[in-house]
Amino acid sequence: MPEQPRRPSDQEQNQSETGPPTNKRRRIGLACNACRSRKSRCDGQRPSCSSCLSLGFDCMYEPGDSATNVIVRKDYVTDLEQRVSSVEHNLQRLNDVLKGHLSPCTNANTSPCHHGTINAGPSMPSPAPTAPTKASAPSGARTGTCATSLEEPQDEEGIPNGMAMTFVEEKTSAFYGEASNINFTQLLLRAIAVAHDSPGAPSGLDRASVLGESVVASVSQSKSSLGGTATPFDSLPTALPSVEEMDTLLDLYFDTAGVVFPFIHEETMRKTYNECRLNGFTRARRTWLGTLNMVFAMASNFDRDYTTSSKKRFERSNIFYKRAMGLCNELSKRVISLEIVHYLILVVLHCQGTSRSVQAWNNYGLVIRSAMALGLHAESTERALNPVQKEYRRRTWVVIYCLDKVLSTAVGRPASIPDEQMMRREPSSGRSPATSGNAADLPGDFLAVSFRMYQVMSKSLVIQYGANLDHDSELDEMAHLKASGELRKQLRLWAANLPPHLQLCDVESDVLLQNTKANRLRVILTMRYHNLSILIHKPLLSATILHLFRQGDAANDASSYLIQLAMAEAHECIRSAQLTIDIVHSVITVDATSKNNLGVWYFTLYYVFTASLVICGRLLWAQHGDTVVDEASASHMRFLLGKAETIFLNLDHENSLVLSCLEYVRRLSRMCGIRETGPDAASASIHDNGSNSTGSADAMSFDLDNMDPFQLFASEMFDPAIFDHFNQSPVDGMSFVNGLWDGFPCGG
């Protein structure tokens, strides 16, 4: 019989009634949208319920219109409070860090952080647009283009370091060797100290203590901005001006700098430019676009038809320069190509015309390494190339060689390319492979003859200046005479073998005033010739000053036969300086525009400034070289310095670099021309100097913005220790140490 189910006893029934209640379904105040639409159970977890997590749905909670009293769990509110508290704590810590980092930047005029912000490049650019964009051009009145399909560079300087670190102001130390103008000026200043019986003057102006010493100048970094405030469009590396402006700048470059330094093939450059212009610059090589911007930067720097104000031209040029930096600055350190080498050469040339002399030298080192890595020095790398490519690779290497000698002379540092590496690398003269028929290649001829002239300069640097190596061995007067005579013979032989269309011109020649491309090259060659002649004969002028300005009995010794010969040969240096000033003065007084035959203004500035220093040396010789003043020579030297002042005043307008050279030559010439140190003599000398010049110091616009380049000049060339205990200054009769350096921003 089946077993009957047992009925629970009364005790068991009572226990079940008083026991814990059974679990009921927990109701939530608001279900998520997915669970409500599926009509499934929702556990109400935030931010995502378990059902949505398992099914991969987006969990969203949206109260309905009738949900006026939504129940929110206490644990959810507690979790929100903890998260808010954590965020507030992190923000407070970050705020404390930023306070320590930004507190030194409150003073915008003196803060190193502020200066670093100004000198930094453009901030991190936004992504390039997907189509050509029209915006304001650098001129502010024209439409512009923005190249696309380019990777935007990242500016690391614009990223905060987050370390609450404050950088102190850096100092720049530079060595200027025996061939530099700075070293020659140091010799003149020591001779001035001897002439005025300064107790702090060296006991003897021997070559080991003067010409052979290291001239190291510590100068502060410039605190002024290098350009005007750029618009967001200008800060884009891919931004370009209007087509009309680009065409004008291209024509200007290939008519000026492209003729003097013909290392870029114009036809190839214009072909690529036209292709990019037709496609709206939607596809362009980064290296080519960077080179194009450097071409624009150079052209706009000496485009005086755009504006006569150098400040405005520089602001415009600096926009293109920064764009080129944004495109190729980092790329040039890891990519080897001919376009990168061209870009770097243009950077070096551009920096020579600005206050970026340190950048010019540093970038030139990168030019050398990139060119050698590309094999421009080797003929074997050209076997698979066509004649045009071979020729322009060779021209690029020759331009680098010429720049090597120019920079080595200007700053007095060892050259990087020995003459042995130029074997069979001379550019072809006559007809270029790019020209058709019998058309002459004027830029190619000019580069070929310039190359041979710079080979003579290279020999002068090695033989006469010890390759600018701070060497202990010194040449005696006989060795200087022999070296100068041999190099002068080579230089004159070079001039005699010039082709008819590139012959040198004299002061009275009509070539100076007939503005043609060939005549401009002839004038430039003439200035280069006289500048090299100054370099060859300057050791003899230095030897003369060393002999004349010796303290004690050495100054009264009878001059030897060799010293007499050195003095006679030193006049060749003075003659070349005089011809340089006369030629430039003849051109600039008739035509002061950029279309004259002088070429790029900053190379003319270098030639005239070098010649002016030589004239100052001859003025010092005439005033203090003997017991009797050579009044005729002193008067003629002052007349030449007056011409040089006219050149500086007309060479450019509102140009701080030109004004710095003018101010420096003025003050140095006053120091060389004062016979006594009394206030009356100083006043008389200043009056005489002003009467011989065409412009007055008061009329010159030399504001605070222009003082920074002069401060660099003065701190590099002046050594205040020379005039220790020299109570009277040769200028204005003021205390030299306590007054001159406080009144003039020369530094120390």
UniProtKB/Swiss-Prot annotation:
One of its GO terms (molecular function) is zinc ion binding. Its main location: nucleus. Transcription factor; part of the Fusarium detoxification of benzoxazolinone cluster 2 (FDB2) involved in the degradation of benzoxazolinones produced by the host plant. Maize, wheat, and rye produce the 2 benzoxazinone phytoanticipins 2,4-dihy-droxy-7-methoxy-1,4-benzoxazin-3-one (DIMBOA) and 2,4-dihydroxy-1,4-benzoxazin-3-one (DIBOA) that, due to their inherent instability once released, spontaneously degrade to the more stable corresponding benzoxazolinones, 6-methoxy-2-benzoxazolinone (MBOA) and 2-benzoxazolinone (BOA), respectively. One of its GO terms (biological process) is DNA-templated transcription. PROSITE patterns: ZN2_CY6_FUNGAL_1, ZN2_CY6_FUNGAL_2. GO terms for cellular component: nucleus. This is Transcription factor FBD3. Residues 1-10 have a biased composition (Basic and acidic residues). Transmembrane segments: none annotated. Fusarium verticillioides possesses 2 unlinked loci, FDB1 and FDB2, necessary for detoxification of antimicrobial compounds produced by maize, including 2-benzoxazolinone (BOA). The FDB2 cluster arose as a duplication of the FDB1 cluster with rearrangement and expansion by incorporating additional genes. It is found in: Nucleus. Residues 32-59 bind DNA. The keyword Cytoplasm does not apply. Induction: Expression is induced in response to 2-benzoxasolinone (BOA) exposure. Pfam families: Fungal_trans, Zn_clus. Disruption phenotype: Decreases, but does not eliminate the ability to metabolize 2-benzoxasolinone (BOA). Residues 131-141 have a biased composition (Low complexity). Residues 1-26, 116-160, 417-438 are annotated as: Disordered. Keywords: DNA-binding, Metal-binding, Nucleus, Transcription, Transcription regulation, Zinc. Residues 11-21, 429-438 have a biased composition (Polar residues).
